[in-house]
Amino acid sequence: MVIAVYPGTFDPFTRGHEDLVRRASNIFDELVVGVAQSPNKRPFFALEERIHIAREVLGHYPNVRVEGFSGLLKDFVRKNNARVIVRGLRAVSDFEYEFQMAGMNRYLLPDVETMFLTPSDQYQFISGTFVREIAQLGGDVSKFVFPSVERWLVEKVGRRHAESDKTA
């Protein structure tokens, strides 16, 4: 049984993320989507919200489970007995960072491989950062995220706008 881990911040979980999960779940016996705490990135959604959102989107995949983690990826990979780390590459700009991370992961986990998947054409330009910016500026994100994720975004953006109106 080959277990793979697909780690990320998933802030928010996009159609591009789901595309990679769908494809990776067809390759591996079990896929663990690891939602990283990532405090240095100052996520828009709290860790528990991101886990909940990912579970809403991915609940219909029988061989996929979603777990949150903090700390080193190597510890999460070991905890889940994974033999592969799945990473997405959208563009050449992603490659340099991901290549360095794969090298470090190989050093820390010599018996674990990193597998890169490129997104389907319609998802190559989607990033969580772009989706958050569009949502915060009142734009339509429905083509980039699932309806449940869009509802979370609209609610969160509305709360933040209401809070900033109170302080202004």
Swiss-Prot record:
ATP binds at residues 9-10, 17, 88-90, 98, 123-129. It comes from Ralstonia nicotianae (strain ATCC BAA-1114 / GMI1000). GO terms for biological process: coenzyme A biosynthetic process. The record marks 17 as: Transition state stabilizer. Reversibly transfers an adenylyl group from ATP to 4'-phosphopantetheine, yielding dephospho-CoA (dPCoA) and pyrophosphate. It is found in: Cytoplasm. It comes from the Bacteria. It catalyses: (R)-4'-phosphopantetheine + ATP + H(+) = 3'-dephospho-CoA + diphosphate. Belongs to the bacterial CoaD family. Its cofactor is Mg(2+). Its main location: cytoplasm. InterPro entries: Cyt_trans-like, PPAT, Rossmann-like_a/b/a_fold. GO terms for molecular function: ATP binding; pantetheine-phosphate adenylyltransferase activity. Keywords: ATP-binding, Coenzyme A biosynthesis, Cytoplasm, Magnesium, Nucleotide-binding, Nucleotidyltransferase, Transferase. The keyword Hydrolase does not apply. One of its GO terms (cellular component) is cytoplasm. This is Phosphopantetheine adenylyltransferase. It is an enzyme of class 2 (transferase). It holds the Pfam family CTP_transf_like. Substrate binds at residues 9, 41, 73, 87. Homohexamer. Pathway: Cofactor biosynthesis; coenzyme A biosynthesis; CoA from (R)-pantothenate: step 4/5. NCBIfam families: coaD_prev_kdtB, cyt_tran_rel. Its EC number is 2.7.7.3.
